[in-house]
A protein has these predicted regions:
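Secondary-structure junction/capping motif
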Residues: 4-6, 172, 202
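Short alpha-helical segments and helix-capping/turn motifs at coil-helix boundaries
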Residues: 4-6, 54, 107-109
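Short microdomains enriched in Cys/His and/or Lys/Arg
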Residues: 49-59
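Short acidic/His/Gly/Ser-rich catalytic and metal-binding motifs that mark active-site loops
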Residues: 30-32, 199-206
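N-terminal pre-triad scaffold of radical SAM enzymes
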Residues: 2-41, 57-73, 98-102, 120-121, ...
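Short, ordered loop/turn segments at secondary-structure junctions
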Residues: 196
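Conserved non-cysteine loop/helix-boundary elements of the Radical SAM core domain that shape
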Residues: 40-50, 69-190, 204-209
């Protein structure tokens, strides 16, 4: 599934249109217990290149491309280079890329590829800063991994945003307060807040059966 949205600045002025491209579970070596991207985005049987051509082909207006639905940092460098090569025919209209990802694994070659290909903004997912809950969610990273990635990427001049969730199993109000305090301290460009949704055919769903 592909859709279009526009970014709006804090003065309410419409800026560049963002064209999201969904990459279900790309780079996810460990799947979070609540996640089933097939349900969230729909799985298009056509090749990724065909989907990109469909949404960008014939377009004249400038746009930004968002890469969502997977863990970009977990994609092997060769495959990441190949992914960006699919957008080469549209460099005349693409003004940059944004993406969402876990904070790990953060490799030097991955950072280099993202910089060379015009990635401007990275949304780092951190459902909670409680390491016990992160482990129960099968996130395969810790809160300290998020801090390290945020510092490294900020030093590389990427714009940074954060995503967190509420309603997690075992979560307390103290956990939520800790998350808010950490995000205020980190000062991301913006924050996305997601409620936990229990989807069929996920480990989380089976816990509720």
């Amino acid at each position: 599934m592909l859709f279009r949205c526009r970014t709006v600045d804090n003065m309410g002025e419409v800026r560049t249109m963002v064209i999201p491209v969904f990459l279900p579970h790309a780079g996810c070596t460990a799947r979070c217990i609540y996640c089933h991207q097939g349900y969230i985005t729909g799985i298009d049987e056509k090749s990724l290149r065909e989907r990109i051509d469909r949404v960008l082909g014939g377009r004249a207006e400038p746009c930004e491309v968002g890469l969502f639905g997977g863990n970009i940092f977990g994609v092997e460098p060769y495959d990441l280079e190949r992914l960006f090569s699919y957008f080469i025919p549209y460099h005349g209209i693409i003004q940059g890329f944004r993406l969402s990802t876990k904070p790990v694994p953060l490799r030097d070659d991955t950072v280099d590829i993202l910089k060379r290909n015009g990635v401007r903004l990275i949304e780092l997912g951190i459902p909670t800063f409680n390491d016990a809950i992160l482990a129960a969610l099968n996130r395969a990273h810790t809160a300290n991994d998020l801090f390290r990635a945020f510092d490294r990427l900020g030093g590389e001049k990427f714009r940074l945003a954060l995503q967190f969730m509420v309603g997690l199993p075992g979560e307390t109000m103290g956990d939520i307060e800790e998350t808010v305090e950490n995000m205020v301290r980190l000062r991301p460009e913006y924050i996305r807040i997601y409620p936990l949704v229990v989807l069929r055919n996920t480990p989380l769903y089976r816990l509720y059966e």
